[in-house]
Design a protein with these regions (language model features):
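Short, solvent-exposed loop/turn elements at beta->coil junctions and helix N-caps
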Residues: 10-14
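Alpha-helical transmembrane signal-anchor/signal-peptide segments
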Residues: 1-7
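Extracytosolic and intramembrane catalytic regions of membrane-associated proteins
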Residues: 15-159
Length: 159
């Protein structure tokens, strides 16, 4: 009903229920995300876009670690540059929280080039591009479970 032309759509029930659903649509250059409760009074609305920015990853695209991240995310990821840090956001598990499409995605990794003097080898002893990939945000970090559960229950009731 949003008249959005999309490449792919992914819907799934949120945890522990089949009343509150999440939806993610892939556009040519971005993703949109929404929640929908069976108790909502209006149809789901995709309002906030998250640009893919896949071009930010191009200098590292042939790196084995980067390819593993892309596979892990099923190809559903966005890139951001925050405070001069290149961040890979895995969209596979959705967003943290239920605040009208504005919450961050659950999994993210900072990608940085290591010191050029450091040489990394893969399992075949071939030289690799030296990259450091560090998980910086996950569903386990800085959680306020009681608050999140209350937000979940409120959103479940519908808007």
């Amino acid at each position: 009903d949003n008249n959005i032309e999309y490449k792919d759509i992914n819907t799934r029930a949120t945890y522990f229920n089949s009343i509150l659903w999440s939806g993610q649509i892939e556009l040519e250059d971005s993703y949109m995300f929404t929640y929908y409760s069976l108790f909502d009074k209006s149809p789901p609305s995709f309002t906030k876009k998250f640009p893919k920015n896949h071009d930010m990853l191009m200098p590292f695209i042939d790196n084995k670690k980067i390819q593993q991240l892309i596979i892990l995310s099923n190809g559903h990821y966005i890139m951001t540059n925050e405070n001069n840090e290149l961040i890979f956001w895995n969209l596979k598990l959705g967003q943290k929280g239920f605040d009208k499409n504005a919450s961050p995605y659950i999994w993210s990794y900072v990608i940085e080039k290591t010191d050029q003097s450091e040489i990394l080898l893969d399992e075949t002893n071939e030289k690799m591009n030296a990259l450091k990939i560090q998980e910086v945000r996950s569903f386990r970090n800085n959680r306020k479970y009681s608050e999140e559960f209350n937000n979940f229950m409120e959103r479940l009731k519908g808007i």
